[in-house]
């Protein structure tokens, strides 16, 4: 049996997550254009050029040092001049409110969410859900 396109793209997001050096949470994201083309990927990790030290990936330091997968995806697309307008973003975990803001501002039209879980407060996700709904960004499980 052949996998569906959504399964295929979520597989890319999971593959991107495998690049994360975070010992407890690996998140990946992939932006797919309206014609099914992959436009950008991202995973949670240190910013480009920042020294990669293991202690920076441990709690609570990682909250100060790391960027979320969705933030890295948006930043990488901007860095190389790729528009995310109208894209679907496949992400392994539900976006937090900060990442929701970035995705909305980048013009993403749909979020496809994997089954990953995090220890972030529930209010993060509730706020993100409201922002997605109010801004017209569709969310699919």
Language-model features: locations:
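Zinc-dependent deaminase catalytic domain
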Residues: 1-141
């Amino acid at each position: 049996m052949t996998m569906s396109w959504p399964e295929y793209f979520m597989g890319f997001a999971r593959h991107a997550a495998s690049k994360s050096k975070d010992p407890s949470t690996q998140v990946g994201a992939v932006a797919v254009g309206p014609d099914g083309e992959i436009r950008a990927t991202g995973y949670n990790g240190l910013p480009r050029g920042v020294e990669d030290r293991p202690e920076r990936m441990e709690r609570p330091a990682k909250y100060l040092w790391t960027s979320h997968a969705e933030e890295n995806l948006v930043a990488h697309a901007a860095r190389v001049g790729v528009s995310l307008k109208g894209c679907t973003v496949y992400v392994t975990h539900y976006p937090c409110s900060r990442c929701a803001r970035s995705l909305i501002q980048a013009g993403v039209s749909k979020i496809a969410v994997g089954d990953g879980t995090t220890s972030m407060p529930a209010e993060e996700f509730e706020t993100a859900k409201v922002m997605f709904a109010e801004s017209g960004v569709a969310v699919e499980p």
